[in-house]
């Protein structure tokens, strides 16, 4: 007995002794709690509350769940989950709280009402995805599982999952929507978590029914380096991981085969093949120019960055839309086609011009409304004129945008625009102090005014002009009456009220100055009914000379006055004028004597002059004669608050010039470098020079000698040092070294010979092995016995594959063809021509498997550039010969010291040169051997080809071995399942004996979906595989699909109109994989309505205990249902009409039928076919002849329409599918439904699911609740 078994028995004995525990202290007792109490407990997050709520949710019925959802229970859970995920998992308690919270969300989604409620709101799935932003791997695993289940649950769930990933990408500032999945997959080493991530990828890819959508989603993952990660994951020995990997590879192979079939043999996943096909298609047409232009434009788009990604996605959408419009654009012009391409469903976005028009109109309306309330002073309306609108010449916005409001006066607008100068500078810089929407300014002398709204600005005082208009080319026109203060700098006293509309306004640049209203300032006419706007757009007359006394207009100033008619209060913005030149009068309180010393400053806040001169201000009264003048004592202030004066330094005697301690004739930089060079030897200068004289290279390497050659003394330095006659001790260290070096005869030649001898040894050590390796690689290719045999095998296979084409009947091929063996894909997943060749070689020519040994020398020589190493050796030999010539002409001491050393280096270099000559000869032989051009053959490229082929060869061998091991494991799993099936106890009829409760079991949606995912999407693949085989020989019905009567509509006493017995083997052979069984429990009578049913048991979730644990080991998909009728009950006890199964009954068993309303009807579950459709009448007749089956099956009516049962996950969840997407079924429990068959697309089956009112239910009372457990098959 193992330790683990002993511990389990001890725990079991202890539990039996203690007896059943009434409650778990870690869970709140909410067995009979109402939804309101659970909602209140949710507002106090704790592990106890969440655990109790989970149990209540699992044991709840449909009505309770609906009340819980309607009272925002799911909202509270998701908000709590997002809040918990946001604060991290610094403590274990936080991690446990997150886990219990996500378990409650999973319990909600396990019910049909919960998952439908979540799918009804886009925000719920988005909130769920935000829980991924946590470091708790367990929480992320559960969230990913829920997203995967949503993907395969329904098309709506798949779309919401993709939307949630897009939302998560935006919230977390990621570049791609699948980045969160791929980053977790690449960084995690937790195998169960990796399996979950792969299941999410498979669910996202297999979710859509459209083939191109699946291929596009798969391409997105492949673009994020998914294939590289899968290659690494295949090395992990995990059964669940291998299931997901096989599911991905099988689906990928099937989709690629289908795409290639509908694309005329073009591999749509290969960029090169798609482009080659497209170029061949348009190369002989004018469209090739457009294609080239498009490609040139795409070259400028960067794929990185947020903007680049959006541009590529937008271009993809445009191309997809162009494909849709291609068949309907014959009679359209280019403009119409572009407009249709760029059209967007829904309300179009307004253009910038429309936005400007709208803003102008809105401002006008607001200004009119505010004017009617705020204007209290009557305004002047000149006789013969109309109220004025906001002039486009004076508006800071666009002239074009303002033209909408002044359309009634086109002539005035045209004249106003022509008066503008062409180069119009932006006006925003000249009006920084104005409100965001300044009103038009009063324009004097307008000829064609329009009725305007008044400005919404604070009311300015009239007649207070601030500055003159900006200087136009002509001077401003004369003003018939003098404008009060129109040309002054300082504001004059304000005139008596009421304010006049045409006084002293300045237009913003660049419009020219405008004339004022004639005689509008002299009198005060009665107020007009509507208040006019002071500004108006005039038509400037020919400009006469300026009036006498008028100041020429200064340059444009940053501000101007804005007169208004409200309350006589003025807000003035004047230009800053410097009065220090004496051009203007200075008040007495500003007349101070300048200080003679530099004074300390008083940190005050200076008031602007225009503010300080207000007539009611304190500062304005200082200039009146009645104010007494106060004069401070400036002298005392100057003494106290001046900076102390610096005392001049007394001239001191100049110090005597010191004699320098050292004498140097070198510049500072060279002296520093030489000192650094000498310090590395850690010895005296005499020792260094003695080593140079003796030729000792023990402390000199090549780099040191190269540095010494650069630091040798120059000609002028040598002359200065030789002319120095004083003591050498006065020289610096560097100069002393040079003096010692000059005493050595022929010191430059000695240093050069030392460097050549050391350098030659290094060159020989580096170049000689490479040259020898290249020579060996050439010889190995020329002498290999396996390479010609392998190439002969490839030649025969290639002639077989290319038979009948221009590439067939070949006598040989380029050696680079070996790299293309992996480009020829087989029908089997992950098997190429090279894989198959190696399998054949392993069977018939096992010696060829050692070819990688023959290719090892070329692989090692790959990357060696023969030309570079040859040139380096030749240059070194040339330097050696030159040094030998110099030594032979030198003194005998140098000859004796270096002649032999140089001769030995020269001989070694010449030997190396002979190796290069041999390499050149082998190159010519290799070019002749491989049928290559000797002038074009590159040894480096040839060796690189051999290295790449050797790597492919070795990898293919390993992959073949791994694939065999995986196939062996899969076979062992099948045998294990078969043995378990054989060990299952059976009754006398050969049917498995059922155990467990006799109550109806409700399907847990999420658990059933995840069980199918863990099995590798078996139901989905079964449905698709069966649909592909059946669709090829089926004739689509011409009549529209119609709902048929349920199979139970026949008279129960008469049985069915089909044969009562069928050969079981024949039926199984007809559809070997078309039927999946949902194992039923032992039938028991249904309780009557008068009796109280047993309380509903807790719906256990596989989050805590896998639901497969509740099944007996004999429950397998191959079991046959027991005879009789199997009525099916929904979650709330609503039973559908029973359905009989005549095709799967053993011989001699007749079908019995009971009415659905009979309370004694047997309960159970029935045999299902995931996403099944029946054969057409014609095909049924043909198949009936070969298999002796009746033309009308149990799931069909007389018209041949399919009424066979579907998967529970397809039918029991009514909102899960639309009428278009119907081929994905991923559940275990099944419910019969009325269904039709439609023909759509490429003859692939489609189901039409009726609405709820087409299903026939037999409702039970709420008191009769079935005992529910999760049945996962």
From Swiss-Prot:
Residues 589-979 form the FH2 domain. Residues 1007-1022 form the WH2 domain. Residues 1195-1204 have a biased composition (Acidic residues). Residues 1242-1251 have a biased composition (Basic residues). Residues 1047-1059 have a biased composition (Polar residues). InterPro entries: ARM-like (IPR011989), ARM-type_fold (IPR016024), FH2_Formin (IPR015425), FH2_Formin_sf (IPR042201), FH3_dom (IPR010472), GBD/FH3_dom (IPR014768), GTPase-bd (IPR010473), WH2_dom (IPR003124). Residues 2-330 form the GBD/FH3 domain. The modification Phosphothreonine is found at residues 1203, 1223, 1230. Changing residue 1019 to A: Strongly inhibits depolymerization. It holds the Pfam family Drf_GBD. One of its GO terms (cellular component) is perinuclear region of cytoplasm. Residues 1-30, 346-387, 427-559, 960-999, 1021-1273 are annotated as: Disordered. Residues 907-984 form a coiled coil. The WH2 domain acts as the DAD (diaphanous autoregulatory) domain and binds to actin monomers. Belongs to the formin homology family. Severs actin filaments and accelerates their polymerization and depolymerization. This is Inverted formin-2.
């Amino acid at each position: 007995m193992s330790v683990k078994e002993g511990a389990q028995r001890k725990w079991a004995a202890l539990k039996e002794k203690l007896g059943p525990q009434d409650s778990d202290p870690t869970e709140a007792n909410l067995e009979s709690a109402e939804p309101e109490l659970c909602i209140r407990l949710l507002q106090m997050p704790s592990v106890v509350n969440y655990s109790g709520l989970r149990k209540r949710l699992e044991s709840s019925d449909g009505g309770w769940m609906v009340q819980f959802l309607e009272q925002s229970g799911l909202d509270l859970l998701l908000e709590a989950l997002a809040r918990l995920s946001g604060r991290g998992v610094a403590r274990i308690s936080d991690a446990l709280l997150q886990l219990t919270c996500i378990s409650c969300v999973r319990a909600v989604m396990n019910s049909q009402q919960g998952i439908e409620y979540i799918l009804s709101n886009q925000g719920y799935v988005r909130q769920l995805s935000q829980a991924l932003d946590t470091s708790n791997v367990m929480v992320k695993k559960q969230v990913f599982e829920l997203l995967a289940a949503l993907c395969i649950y329904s098309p709506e769930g798949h779309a919401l999952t993709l939307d949630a990933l897009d939302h998560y990408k935006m919230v977390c500032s990621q570049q791609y929507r699948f980045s969160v999945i791929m980053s977790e997959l690449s960084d995690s080493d937790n195998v169960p978590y990796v399996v979950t991530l792969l299941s999410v990828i498979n669910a996202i890819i297999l979710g859509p029914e459209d083939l191109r959508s699946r291929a596009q989603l798969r391409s997105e993952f492949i673009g994020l380096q998914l294939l590289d990660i899968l290659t690494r994951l295949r090395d992990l020995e995990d059964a669940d991981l291998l299931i997901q990997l096989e599911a991905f590879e099988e689906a990928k192979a099937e989709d690629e085969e289908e795409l290639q079939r509908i694309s005329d043999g073009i591999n749509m996943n290969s960029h090169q093949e798609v482009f080659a096909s497209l170029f061949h298609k348009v190369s002989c047409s004018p469209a090739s120019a457009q294609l080239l232009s498009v490609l040139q434009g795409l070259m400028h788009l960067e794929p990185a960055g947020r903007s680049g990604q959006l541009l590529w996605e937008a271009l993809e959408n445009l191309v997809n839309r162009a494909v849709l419009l291609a068949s309907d654009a014959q009679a359209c012009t280019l403009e119409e086609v572009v407009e249709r391409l760029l059209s967007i469903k829904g309300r179009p976005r307004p253009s910038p011009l429309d936005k400007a028009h709208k803003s102008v109109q809105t401002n006008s309306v607001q200004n009119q409304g505010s004017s009617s309330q705020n204007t209290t002073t009557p305004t002047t309306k000149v006789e013969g004129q109309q109220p004025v609108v906001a002039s486009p010449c004076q508006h800071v916005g666009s002239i074009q945008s303002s033209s909408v409001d002044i359309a009634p006066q086109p002539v005035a607008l045209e004249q106003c625009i022509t008066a503008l100068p062409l180069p119009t500078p932006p006006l925003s810089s000249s009006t920084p102090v104005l409100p965001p929407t300044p009103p038009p300014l009063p324009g004097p002398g307008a000829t064609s005014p329009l009725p305007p709204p008044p400005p919404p600005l604070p009311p300015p005082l009239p007649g207070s002009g601030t500055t003159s208009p900006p200087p136009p080319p002509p001077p401003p026109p004369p003003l018939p009456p003098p404008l009060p203060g129109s040309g002054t700098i300082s504001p004059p006293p304000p005139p008596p009220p009421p304010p006049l509309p045409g006084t002293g306004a300045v237009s913003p640049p660049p419009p020219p100055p405008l004339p004022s209203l004639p005689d509008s300032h002299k009198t005060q006419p009665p107020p007009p009914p509507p208040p006019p706007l002071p500004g108006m757009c005039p038509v400037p007359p020919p400009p006469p000379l300026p009036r006498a006394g008028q100041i020429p207009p200064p340059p444009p100033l940053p501000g101007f006055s804005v007169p208004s008619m409200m309350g006589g209060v003025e807000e003035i913005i004047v230009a800053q004028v410097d009065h220090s030149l004496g051009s203007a009068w200075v008040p007495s309180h500003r007349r101070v004597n300048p200080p003679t010393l530099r004074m300390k400053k008083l940190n005050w806040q200076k008031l602007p002059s225009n503010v300080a001169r207000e007539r009611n201000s304190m500062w304005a009264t200082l200039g009146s004669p009645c104010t007494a003048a106060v004069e401070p004592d400036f002298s005392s202030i100057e003494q106290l608050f001046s900076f102390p004066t610096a005392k001049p330094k007394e001239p001191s005697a100049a110090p005597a010039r010191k004699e320098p301690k050292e004498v140097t004739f070198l510049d500072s930089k060279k002296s520093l470098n030489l000192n650094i060079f000498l310090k590395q030897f850690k010895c005296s200068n005499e020792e260094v020079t003695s080593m140079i004289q003796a030729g000792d290279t023990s402390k000199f390497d090549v780099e040191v000698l190269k540095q010494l050659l650069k630091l040798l003394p120059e000609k002028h330095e040598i002359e200065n040092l030789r002319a120095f006659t004083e003591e050498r001790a006065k020289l610096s260290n560097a100069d002393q070294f040079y003096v010692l070096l000059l005493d050595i005869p022929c010191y430059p030649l000695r240093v050069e010979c030392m460097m050549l001898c050391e350098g030659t040894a290094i060159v020989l050590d580096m170049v000689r092995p490479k040259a020898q390796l290249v020579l060996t690689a050439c010889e190995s290719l020329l002498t290999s016995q396996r390479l010609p045999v392998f190439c002969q095998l490839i030649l025969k296979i290639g002639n077989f594959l290319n038979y009948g084409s221009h590439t067939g009947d070949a006598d040989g091929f380029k050696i680079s063809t070996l790299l293309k063996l992996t480009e020829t894909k087989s029908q089997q997943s992950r098997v190429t021509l090279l894989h198959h060749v190696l399998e054949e070689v392993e069977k018939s020519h096992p010696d060829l498997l050692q070819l990688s040994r023959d290719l090892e020398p070329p692989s090692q020589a790959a990357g060696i550039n023969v030309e570079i190493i040859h040139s380096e050796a030749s240059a070194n030999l040339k330097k050696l010969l030159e040094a030998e010539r110099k030594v032979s002409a030198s003194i005998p001491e140098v000859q004796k010291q270096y002649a032999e050393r140089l001769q030995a280096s020269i001989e070694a270099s010449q030997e190396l040169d002979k190796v290069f000559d041999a390499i050149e000869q082998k190159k010519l032989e290799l070019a002749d051997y491989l049928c290559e051009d000797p002038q074009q053959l590159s040894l480096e490229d040839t060796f690189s080809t051999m290295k790449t082929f050797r790597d492919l060869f070795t990898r293919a061998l390993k992959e073949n071995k791994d694939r065999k091991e995986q196939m062996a494991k899969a076979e062992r799993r099948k045998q294990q399942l078969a043995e378990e099936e054989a060990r299952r106890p059976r009754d006398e009829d050969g049917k498995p004996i059922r155990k467990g409760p006799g109550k109806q079991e409700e399907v847990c949606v999420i658990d059933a979906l995840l069980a199918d995912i863990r099995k590798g999407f078996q139901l989905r693949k079964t449905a698709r595989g069966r649909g592909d085989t059946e669709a090829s020989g089926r004739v689509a019905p011409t009549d529209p699909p119609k709902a048929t009567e349920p199979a139970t509509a026949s008279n129960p006493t008469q049985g069915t109109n089909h044969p009562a017995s069928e050969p079981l083997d024949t039926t199984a052979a007809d559809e070997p994989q078309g039927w999946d069984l949902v194992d039923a429990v032992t039938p028991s009578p249904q309780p009557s309505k008068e009796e109280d049913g047993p309380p509903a048991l807790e719906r256990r979730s596989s989050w805590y205990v896998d639901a497969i644990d509740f099944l007996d080991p004999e429950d397998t998909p191959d079991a046959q249902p027991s005879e009789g009728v199997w009525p099916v009950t929904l979650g709330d006890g609503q039973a559908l009409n029973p359905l009989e199964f005549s095709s799967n009954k053993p011989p001699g068993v007749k079908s019995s039928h009971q009415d659905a309303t009979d309370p004694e009807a047997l309960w159970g579950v029935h045999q299902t076919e995931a996403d099944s459709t029946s054969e057409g009448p014609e095909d049924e007749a043909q198949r009936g002849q070969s298999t002796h089956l009746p033309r009308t099956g149990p799931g069909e009516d007389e018209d041949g329409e399919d009424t066979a049962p579907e998967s529970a996950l397809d039918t029991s969840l009514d909102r899960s599918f639309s009428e278009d997407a119907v081929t994905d079924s991923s559940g275990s429990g099944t419910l019969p439904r009325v269904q039709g068959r439609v023909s759509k697309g490429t003859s692939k089956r489609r189901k039409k699911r009726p609405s709820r009112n087409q299903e026939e239910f037999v409702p039970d009372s709420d008191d009769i609740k079935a005992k529910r457990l999760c049945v996962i098959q």
